[in-house]
């Protein structure tokens, strides 16, 4: 199985984020993201958490998925405002994904 590269995972997550953010985020969060993204925005692939089962109610194999966060970083370059967390399958022919949106 070909695993997604960080760039591929980031591109997929960001495309989904742009397409769906308007339906899932508060207008104030969308405005904040749009105003701050150029200066503080980040889309990062992180180590796949083993806690997704608690989030989505399905047991997953962390090695079969990439996890990507979309948000804003602080002055220490830490993502302190996460707008969406993505779990994206490495399988290209059956690209499954899950999103946890900021509440």
From Swiss-Prot:
Family: Belongs to the putative dsDNA mimic protein family.
Superkingdom to which the source organism belongs: Bacteria
Coiled-coil annotated residue ranges, if any: none
Function: May act as a double-stranded DNA (dsDNA) mimic. Probably regulates the activity of a dsDNA-binding protein.
Protein's name in the database: Putative double-stranded DNA mimic protein HD_0986
Cross-referenced SUPFAM superfamilies: Putative dsDNA mimic
NCBIfam families found in the cross-reference section: PRK05094.1
Name of a matching Pfam family: DUF440
Source organism (scientific name): Haemophilus ducreyi (strain 35000HP / ATCC 700724)
Gene3D superfamilies per UniProt: dsDNA mimic, putative
